[in-house]
Amino acid sequence: MQVYADNAATTAMSRTAIDAMLPYLDNIYGNPSSLHSVGQRAKEALDAARETVAQCLGCEPREIIFTSGGSEADNQAIISAARNGEKKGKKHII
């Protein structure tokens, strides 16, 4: 039996997640910032996902930021905390 203990770095996707993502990997893969039809379909899908996540979290869709991975998400959280702290006169993050 194989034991995989590095789930903090990479975790296998569940079959449910793979099945949910297949339409986007196969057909809706465009750059959502593009003006062409493939990009616009991707933008529509991204906007719908943002709306769904916002409803689940009880916030506005404009407050949802999707990132490409853990490091980018960590950096975004630190930058947001620093900016919010700065507004309150706090100059350090510990």
What are these regions (language model features)?
Residues M1-I94:
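Pyridoxal 5′-phosphate
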